[in-house]
Each structure stands twice: as C-alpha cells, then as structure tokens.
Design a protein with these regions (language model features):
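Basic-flanked hydrophobic alpha-helices used for secretion and membrane insertion
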Residues: 1-174
Length: 174
C-alpha cells in the first residue's frame, strides 16, 4: 500500500496511556518543544525525531525472509500493522509509550519540565510484556485533510488540530 501523504496516528483517549485525551503517536510531537535543546549525547536525543510507523515495502519478499513471525501473520490490508522487535525480543523504550504500555502523560510532564529549563529524567524500562499486552493497542488513523473544516463565513479552510474537542470527536469516530 502506498501513501502520498503521511497520516496522523493516535492512541485513543484512555488507552492505558495515562491521558484523558488521544495521544498523537505519528508523527510524534512529544519532543518538539525540546528537540533543539537536547544535546546529542543525551539519552533523550534518540527520542527527538522518532518515527515508529512506516510503510512496508510493496514486495513482501524483501522482508518476509528477514523476519520471523512469532505470532499472528503479516499484514494483508492497509489498516493492519506489524510489531517488529529487536532480535533479542526487546523494544525501544519509546515504543512502550506509543503502545500505551507506559504513562504518556508522565513522559509529557517530564519533557515539559526539560523544555522550561528544569531537570527531569525518564526512567529506562526493563519491563516484560505478554503477547496480549503487545497486541491490545488499537490506533486511530486521521488523514491530514480531516483536521480542516470549511468556514463559510470567511471562505477558508480552518485547521482544527488545536481544537481539542473537535479532535477528540474526530479520533473517537475514526
């Protein structure tokens, strides 16, 4: 499946993310406030421009022989995903937040502190998860055009991405 635009992917509100609002996980914006302030030697540097979702190549032979499916099957539809772990079965700490396995609200709070010049730390994870925990997240897909609404009075399209109520409804019904 090919996409000429990058979709927005959200973890729905209350999806074990510690957030009462949906969390935008693709493209991730958590570190946008602090990206320019993070030194390259900081453990946070690897999070500064994280993209965890990507399109599979059109030719399955490119990846099917390189990976072992431990459970389930390869995606066959545009709205399916595959979780790829490291060879030793571990994952990036940031992926735990994306999957709603760690408290996203706590992460954002720490990032906000760092952005305002305070000190903050993000604990490294050594958690172990079950198959059911890893497969439980349900993501919501929002195309960029859906974040705009026609304003007949002004004769323009209005970006509603900062309107939390609009976005909550849009994501809930996606």
């Amino acid at each position: 499946y090919g996409y000429s635009v990058s979709p927005f992917i959200y973890l729905p509100a209350g999806a074990d993310s510690g957030s009462s609002d949906p969390v935008q996980v693709q493209p991730d914006v958590t570190f946008s406030k602090v990206s320019p302030k993070i030194p390259s030697y900081s453990p946070l540097a690897s999070f500064a421009s994280t993209t965890l979702f990507s399109e599979l190549p059109g030719n399955p032979s490119i990846y099917e022989d390189r990976y072992t499916v431990r459970a389930g099957r390869w995606p066959t539809a545009w709205n399916e995903a595959v979780l790829v772990l490291r060879p030793n079965g571990t994952m990036d700490d940031f992926l735990e937040y994306t999957l709603g396995l760690r408290d996203y609200a706590g992460l954002r709070s720490t990032v906000d502190k760092i952005a305002s010049g305070e000190s903050g730390t993000i604990e490294e994870s050594h958690n172990t998860y079950t198959y059911d925990q890893l497969m439980s997240p349900t993501f919501k897909l929002v195309m960029p055009y859906q974040r705009y609404v026609w304003d007949g009075n002004l004769g323009v399209w209005t970006d509603k991405s900062d309107d939390q109520s609009y976005m909550n409804d849009l994501i809930a019904n996606a």
